[in-house]
Design a protein with these regions (language model features):
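Residues that act as N-cap/strand-start positions at coil-to-secondary-structure junctions
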Residues: 9-11, 22, 33, 73, ...
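Intrinsic-disorder/low-complexity, polar/charged segments enriched in Ser/Thr/Lys/Arg/Asp/Glu/Gln
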Residues: 23-25, 119-123, 140-142, 152-154, ...
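Broad, structure-driven detector of short, well-ordered beta-strand segments within folded domains
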Residues: 24-28, 143-145, 188
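Glycine-rich, pocket-lining loop/helix-strand segments that form or immediately flank
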Residues: 45-61, 84-107, 189-210
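Extended, loop-rich substrate-binding clefts of extracytoplasmic carbohydrate-active enzymes
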Residues: 1-9, 84, 89-149
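Active-site/ligand-binding surface loops and adjacent short beta/alpha elements
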Residues: 87-88, 93, 166-167, 176-244
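Beta-strand-rich N-terminal accessory domains
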Residues: 1-88, 92, 242-244
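Acidic, contiguous internal or C-terminal segments within carbohydrate-active enzymes
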Residues: 17-19, 30, 126-169, 173-175, ...
Length: 244
């Protein structure tokens, strides 16, 4: 049977969902971006999250952050919508970009919870009223974490426009996985994708190229990946596989 417990995590409260029998569990901090701290299957953690409260306070590397109202980088923090120009704060000094939106540190509330024999699910919500001058668009973001005894974790996200006008938005998630001691020995398999080209400021150039590396399970070795990928809508499922 899954259980729900809480404990102090620095100035935050950590919510732990666990099944002592299967040793499956995960923990989140709703009041700081509903960030996922860890995920255990059979007692083995597969998420490289913020292990200490001090790390969460700094939010370095945005580990397991929810990304909204934009998931990537914004050139000079500026964007135009319906003829109006807005400027997000530049929070990535190295590239002079705004990065990952503001959702990653927004307070979220638990709005539903299921604890059963074989799985646990929790939904967190942030009702944003549009108070920031650089994003004056009310919206509601929800994220649901579900863990089950068949060693699966499912994460579902949605963002609903709660205002009267159209809004510019996109969402994403920023996980770091716990891997073997040497990343070179980690095995990776990807579906057929298109790699999104970026410039020296890590901004998309608008170009894409087919990426067929790792079409079968193979070692990462010296491969460096710091790009986004495009997956055609015509395909119903996108699944990646890695072995640690």
């Amino acid at each position: 049977m899954y259980q729900h417990n809480t404990e102090k995590f620095g100035s935050f409260e950590r919510h732990i969902f666990s099944n002592p029998s299967s040793k499956n569990s995960f923990s989140i901090v709703p009041e700081c971006g509903a960030v996922l701290i860890d995920t255990f299957f059979a007692g083995i953690n597969v998420i490289d999250g913020f292990s200490m409260p001090e790390e969460l306070e700094s939010f370095k590397w945005a580990k397991s952050a929810v990304l909204y109202p934009f998931p990537n980088r914004m050139c000079d923090g500026a964007y135009t919508h319906d003829g109006n120009t807005y400027n997000f704060p530049v929070d990535n000094a190295a590239t002079n970009n705004a990065i990952h939106g503001f959702g990653k540190k927004m307070p979220h509330q638990i709005v539903s919870m299921i604890l059963s024999e074989n799985y646990a699910a929790v939904t967190c919500r942030n009702d944003y009223d549009g108070y920031l001058p650089y994003y004056p668009f009310p919206c509601c973001f929800e994220i649901t974490f579900t863990i089950s005894d068949d060693n699966k974790m499912t994460i579902g996200m949605s963002l609903k426009n709660t205002g009267e006008n159209t809004i510019p938005t996109a969402i994403g998630w920023h996980p770091y996985f716990a891997i073997s001691e040497k990343i070179e020995d980690t095995l990776l398999q990807l579906p057929d994708l298109q790699l999104i080209e970026v410039n020296e400021r890590m901004l998309p150039t608008g170009k894409k190229e087919n990426y067929n590396r790792f079409s079968s399970l193979e070692k990462i070795n010296e491969t460096s990946l710091d790009n986004g990928f495009f997956y055609p809508k015509s395909r119903k499922k996108c699944r990646s596989h890695f072995t640690i």
